[in-house]
A protein has these predicted regions:
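Flexible, active-site-proximal loop/turn residues at the rims of small-molecule/cofactor binding pockets
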Residues: 152, 267, 430, 545, ...
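Divalent metal-binding segments
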Residues: 37-45, 50, 54-303, 318, ...
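Glycine- and charge-enriched low-complexity intrinsically disordered segments
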Residues: 570-574
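Bacterial Sec-dependent N-terminal signal peptides
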Residues: 1-37
Length: 574
């Protein structure tokens, strides 16, 4: 049975609570009848309201009228907004209330599908992987694709790439396609290679690599654009599959206190979001990104924008997203100097500087917001250079261009974020997941400027945090913990934290997950802080993480999620 946090629990206490309220009102100079127009639909009192306004003000109570906040302040002050029998009054019993989390970077459709497909996240042995694949194959007709994601060779294969032979032993009747945890490498079996006509004579595609053995034969590992040679053969999810995945993802977002997402999914999700919005079932605000390659074909953009029905503050089109490089885990992130553990490689760039400069300048002139995936220091430098050239050519405007991930930076490039107004859109748990092997890939010197949250803030950069789900868990609280401690959930390293000088405070991290993320999508005037007239999206936490040791963040849950002024999630009873 669910915890009746917002219904029976408070109905049972209502008489006692109202005795208290009436006593307070007796000493108040303002009666209920004097301000009828201000009466609230929902009041939360006796709590700790973390507003995240410009002064980081705290309150004890908050009132909501419709889908907007109409009061933040004291328990006494909120009495003017209560109408007995009509206003829902909730005693928070000291629990903190924060703005709803805004996930600035995730893949909502992929996340939902990952919960419905083979999920290899966290598998530490080949036996675990085989067990999950066999369970899926048992219910999959011969000849049909087996698709999954989440494997990480640094967990189960001594850091070495797995190969097709292992998958061939599990099935020779199903083509298998499994993406790595970062989504930038595919592991396939021989049948999948055969279906794609990939053999020793197949050249590497531009921006990709077919990993080969000593004889030149494909091993079953396909990096970056090479993965598309197989991925393009896999039947697309049906409308029903996508709808189920999005509904599953929305349920996950609710329980994690996420009320806004900045989504990098297939644009086929737009009709699904529209339908859910019409039904009143879209309980997360969506900014849907567009492919940067569309900049080359403006007619595609015009066609989509003319057909797309924006739904106010609920559903809108977001920036144009592109990729400059890959990831550290797969050694495809683009670096100035070779990888410490592979002197033959600097990663795989997706653009030459001149092409990137031209495209970004063109997009900026058209007034489009741009965000580019860049992880390696060379990739980040390339994007910053292109943004600077666009500014010099087109003049300064409120573009709010972004770099997604911004994981490895040169010291001289960090000030450019603030100088150019470029948003660093980062995911804190990447730091604590990657630290297991980051020094092996980069060496200690480059790690000093990796995941450099503190340095970026010092140089007046705007931070926007997200989860990158399903690459990392859809849990912003884990991100808060990572940003504050730079430790993994097990508490490692114990002392000191991993390059601890780049850690930030809890309030700074929370701002990046809320008002900072809202700024990154031009909606900081609507949401991201708990202020009068802003949208009533908020989260009640089970513990006061602002006074407890940081490790308690991981033991904290979302007690309730309020979206658009409505309670949409209540934590189940234990």
């Amino acid at each position: 049975m669910k915890r009746i946090f917002f219904s029976l629990l408070f109905r049972q206490r209502r008489m006692c609570l109202w005795h208290i309220l009436i006593s307070i009102l007796f000493f108040s100079s303002i009666t209920f009848s004097q301000k009828q127009t201000q009466k609230a639909d929902l009041v939360l009192l006796n709590g700790k309201i973390i507003t995240l306004d410009s002064h980081n003000t705290q309150g004890r109570a908050i009132a909501v009228k419709g889908n907007r906040i109409n009061y933040v302040g004291t328990n006494v002050g909120v009495m003017d907004y209560i109408q007995q029998g009509k206003t829902q009054v909730i005693d928070l019993q000291g629990k903190p209330v924060i703005p709803g989390f805004n996930d600035a970077h995730l893949h909502f459709l992929s996340g939902g599908l990952s919960l419905l497909r083979v999920n290899l996240t966290g598998c530490k042995t080949k036996t675990e992987i085989a067990t999950k694949l066999k369970a899926k194959i048992k219910n999959t007709p011969k000849g049909s694709w087996v698709v999954g994601r989440g494997w990480d060779h640094t967990l189960f294969n001594k850091g070495q790439w797995p190969d097709k032979k292992f998958l061939d032993q599990i099935t020779s009747f199903h083509p298998v396609y499994l993406t790595r945890i970062d989504g930038h490498v595919a592991w396939v079996n021989s049948l999948a290679l055969l279906e794609a006509n990939i053999d020793k004579n197949t050249p590497d595609p531009e921006g990709g690599e077919i990993v080969r053995d000593a004889l030149g034969n494909p091993t079953g590992i396909l990096k970056e654009n090479a993965a598309d040679l197989v991925a393009n053969l896999i039947p697309s999810p049906t409308d029903g599959d996508m709808q189920k995945a999005i509904q599953t993802a929305i349920a996950e977002a609710k329980k994690n206190g996420i009320t806004s997402i900045q989504d990098n999914s297939d644009l086929n999700v737009l009709p699904i979001y529209n339908t859910l919005a019409e039904q009143g079932n879209l309980t997360v605000r969506v900014s849907e990104w567009l492919p940067f390659e569309w900049i080359k074909t403006p007619e595609k953009v015009d066609s989509l924008k003319s057909a797309f029905k924006e739904r106010g503050n609920l559903l809108k089109l977001g920036p144009f997203k592109g990729y400059v490089d890959g990831t550290l885990g797969s050694r495809t992130a683009y670096l100035f100097e070779p990888y410490t553990d592979d002197s033959t490689s600097v990663g795989i760039p997706q653009y030459k500087q001149e092409e990137l400069d031209s495209l970004i300048t063109k997009a900026d002139k058209m007034g489009y917001q741009i965000c580019f995936h860049a992880i390696g220091d060379k990739a980040n430098s390339m994007v910053l250079t292109a943004y600077q050239k666009a500014l010099e050519t087109n003049g300064r405007q409120d573009a709010r261009h972004r770099i997604e991930h911004a994981q490895v930076l040169r010291e001289e490039d960090i000030p450019l974020f603030g100088k150019l107004g470029v948003i660093a859109s980062m995911q804190p748990t990447h730091c604590t997941s990657d630290k297991r092997w980051a020094e092996e890939r980069l060496g200690s010197e480059r790690c000093k400027e990796a995941y450099a949250w503190r340095s970026l803030l010092v140089k007046r950069a705007h931070l926007a945090f997200g989860t990158d789900w399903p690459v990392e868990p859809l849990n912003p609280l884990m991100g808060l913990y990572a940003a504050v401690t730079r430790k993994d959930p097990a508490g490692n390293p114990s002392q000191p934290s991993w390059y601890w000088r780049e850690s930030i405070s809890l309030i700074e991290a929370l701002r990046a997950y809320t008002i900072g993320a809202a700024y990154a999508e031009f909606q900081d005037n609507l949401k991201g802080s708990l202020e009068v007239v802003k949208l009533a999206d908020m989260v009640v936490l089970t513990k006061d993480i602002f006074v407890l040791p940081p490790k308690e963040i991981l033991n904290t849950e979302v007690e309730a999620t309020i979206f658009d002024g409505q309670v949409i999630y209540v934590r189940p009873e234990e």
